[in-house]
Amino acid sequence: MTVVRDDPIRPDPGFAELYASLPDATDLWPWLELARAAAPPVLYLGIGAGRLAVPLEAAGIQLVGVDSHPGMLERLHQRLPNTELIQSRIEDLDLGRRFSMVMVPSNLLETVERLRHAAAHLAPAGLLAAELTNPYWLRAGASAGVRVQAFDGNGARFEVDYNLPDGRTVTQRAEVTLVWPDEVENWLATGAGLRLRRMFGRPDAELASSPSFYVVAGRG
């Protein structure tokens, strides 16, 4: 079994290889709808190897991409050579620019430090859109291919299996800080001075059973 880990401080080459091996996303909800409503470019934090970014660019969305993993950005640059890409952890990001939309898919914005740095890049009327791991889903035991190894309400450690097109199975080990849906409004306000505009689960699941949930927030 091949095991990889997302470590922004000590990037795992296998992690970039895994995501480069995954097929591009075909369902762009809700990111395409949100990005189309924003003035370009859209700041994409955690842009990765491009499985979502490439289809978004093909749909006409202009992106500025940030990722901490050099291997991810190297692969993405080969696919999107004209897209501005920046290597940085979210916690260290200071572009000196503001954006109409900051999007953070893939459950990366769970800490207050990351939230503050993302919010600092919002234009006055800009919106932050983020995907967060759903604690209710993890507490219920998650789903097939996901093994919850530790859960204490504030954080979780789990493994996710990916079955690749070439027949291999690669396991990603993950540790997350958890934000509960009923705490999001206060988390946004106290952490970054943001106001919750929308919160919703995936279209095929209620908020309490959705593997992740989505938050849209802005100032004022």
Ranges and model annotations:
Residues 1-48:
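Conserved class I S-adenosyl-L-methionine
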Residues 49-92:
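Class I SAM-dependent methyltransferase SAM/SAH-binding core
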Residues 92-101:
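A short acidic, Gly/Pro-enriched loop at the edge of an enzyme's catalytic core
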Residues 105-106:
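Residues lining the SAM
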Residues 110-118:
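A short, conserved alpha-helix within the catalytic core of class I
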Residues 118, 125, 129-187:
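SAM-dependent methyltransferase
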Residues 181-220:
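C-terminal lobe and adjacent flexible extensions of AdoMet/dcAdoMet transferase-like proteins
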